[in-house]
Regions:
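Short acidic active-site motifs
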Residues: 60, 223-227, 250-254
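An N-terminal-biased, well-structured beta-alpha scaffold segment characteristic
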Residues: 2-110
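Glycine-centered, small-residue-biased loops immediately flanking beta-strands
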Residues: 262
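Short beta->alpha connector loops at strand-helix junctions that form conserved
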Residues: 36-37, 60-61, 94-96, 116-121, ...
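Glycine/serine-rich phosphate-binding loop and adjoining beta1-alpha1 elements at the start
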Residues: 2, 8, 79-170
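A short, aliphatic-rich alpha-helical micro-motif
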Residues: 64-66, 85, 226-233, 255-258
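Glycine-rich phosphate/diphosphate-binding loop of Rossmann-like nucleotide-binding domains
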Residues: 6-45, 152-240
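Short gly/ser/thr-rich secondary-structure transition/capping motifs
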Residues: 52-58, 73-75, 151-157, 215-221, ...
Length: 262
C-alpha cells in the first residue's frame, strides 16, 4: 500500500502522523511511505531521518493526497485538506466528528473511509489510541491550571500544593476516567486538596482505592457538582462519551458562583 503523511497545518499542532520509526516499520512490511518535507520538524525529526527509515520525501501535501491510498495524520483534516481527499482513500487520524457537522458532511461527500483514532476499540472495550493523549491531557491540565491561578495571569494567587501554614489549593476533577485519573494524580502529587466526581460507583471505588487519603471522591449529581465547583480553585472537566461530544456539566450559574480568579 502507498501510505502518505502530510505536515499538520492546524494552529499550534506540532505532532506528526508517522515518526521515522513508524515509517521504518511500514517499509519493513512492504509498504511504500511518502512523507511531506518538514512534516516531522515539530518533533525534531528531519527529512533525512525519514529517508534513512525508507520513506520518500515529497514537497507539499498535494502529491500525498492525490497519490496515496492511505493518508495518516494527527488532527482532523482542515477545509483545504478535505478538498484534496478523493473517493476510496483511507484517512487515519483523530476526527472528533460529533460537534463538527461541516467536517462530517465533507468526508461523506468525499467518499473516503475515515478511521478515527479516538473510536478505535480494543477487545476489552478500551480505547488504545485515545488513552495516551488522554493521559497527556490530564497531566497538562493541572500544569496549565496552576499557571492560570497565578495572580499575573488573573488567577486567585493560589499555590496548588500550599506551603507550611497555608492551605493547599482545591482541585475538583469531573470524571474519573483516564483524563480525570491523570489530572488527579498530578494534582495530588503536588499536594493539592483533590476531589474527584463521577457517576459510576465502580470508578469512584477504583480511584478511591488508588489515592486513599490523597484524594476524596463524590458521586456526581447536580447538587454535589455545584457545591464542589463553588469551593474549587481549579476545576478540570474530564468526562468522555466515546464518539460523542462531551456533555456541558458546569452551568453558567455555577460559573457565576465560583470564587473570583478560580
Amino acid at each position: 500500500m502507498l501510505i502518505g503523511c502530510p505536515k499538520e497545518i492546524k494552529n499550534h499542532e506540532y505532532r506528526v502522523g508517522l515518526t521515522p520509526e513508524s515509517a521504518r516499520e511500514l517499509a519493513r512490511h512492504g509498504h511504500e511511505v511518502w512523507i511531506e518535507s518538514g512534516a516531522g520538524l515539530g518533533i525534531d525529526a528531519t527529512d533525512e531521518e525519514y529517508r534513512t527509515a525508507g520513506a520518500k520525501i515529497v514537497e507539499g501535501p498535494d502529491k500525498i493526497f492525490a497519490g496515496c491510498e492511505m493518508v495518516v495524520k494527527v488532527k482532523e483534516p482542515q477545509a483545504g485538506e478535505r478538498s484534496k481527499l478523493r473517493e476510496g482513500q483511507i484517512l487515519y487520524t483523530y476526527l472528533h466528528l460529533a460537534p463538527d457537522r461541516e467536517q462530517t458532511v465533507d468526508l461523506v461527500n468525499a467518499g473516503v473511509t475515515a478511521i478515527a483514532y479516538e473510536t478505535v476499540t480494543g477487545p476489552h472495550g478500551q480505547l488504545p489510541l485515545l488513552k495516551p493523549m488522554s493521559q497527556v491531557a490530564g497531566r497538562m491540565s493541572v500544569q496549565a491550571g496552576a499557571t492560570a491561578l497565578e495572580k499575573a495571569h488573573g488567577g486567585r494567587g493560589v499555590l496548588l500544593g500550599g506551603v507550611p501554614g497555608v492551605m493547599p489549593g482545591k482541585v475538583v476533577v469531573i470524571g474519573g476516567g483516564v483524563v480525570g485519573f491523570n489530572a488527579a494524580q498530578m494534582a495530588a502529587g503536588v499536594g493539592a486538596d483533590v476531589t474527584i466526581l463521577d457517576r459510576d460507583p465502580e470508578v469512584l471505588e477504583r480511584v478511591g482505592t488508588h489515592f486513599e487519603t490523597r484524594a476524596k471522591t463524590r458521586f456526581s449529581n447536580a447538587a454535589n457538582l455545584h457545591d464542589a465547583v463553588c469551593q474549587a480553585d481549579l476545576v478540570i472537566g474530564a468526562v468522555l462519551i466515546p464518539g460523542a461530544a462531551a456533555p456541558k456539566l458546569v452551568t453558567r450559574e455555577m460559573l457565576g458562583d465560583m470564587q473570583k480568579g478560580a
